[in-house]
């Protein structure tokens, strides 16, 4: 259970960081990476 939760949170953080990078590059420029 704990192992599954760890993988789920890791995948969520990874997906979120990728989304933020894409948003920063293609967005309105308010978030700059």
Curated annotation (Swiss-Prot):
It comes from the Bacteria. GO terms for molecular function: electron transporter, transferring electrons within cytochrome b6/f complex of photosystem II activity. One of its GO terms (cellular component) is cytochrome b6f complex. It is a single-pass membrane protein. Disulfide bonds: none annotated. Keywords: Electron transport, Membrane, Photosynthesis, Thylakoid, Transmembrane, Transmembrane helix, Transport. The keyword Metal-binding does not apply. It is found in: Cellular thylakoid membrane. Pfam families: PetN. The chain crosses the membrane at residues 2-22. One of its GO terms (biological process) is photosynthesis. The 4 large subunits of the cytochrome b6-f complex are cytochrome b6, subunit IV (17 kDa polypeptide, PetD), cytochrome f and the Rieske protein, while the 4 small subunits are PetG, PetL, PetM and PetN. The complex functions as a dimer. NCBIfam families: PRK02529.1. Belongs to the PetN family. Component of the cytochrome b6-f complex, which mediates electron transfer between photosystem II (PSII) and photosystem I (PSI), cyclic electron flow around PSI, and state transitions. This is Cytochrome b6-f complex subunit 8. It comes from Prochlorococcus marinus (strain MIT 9211).
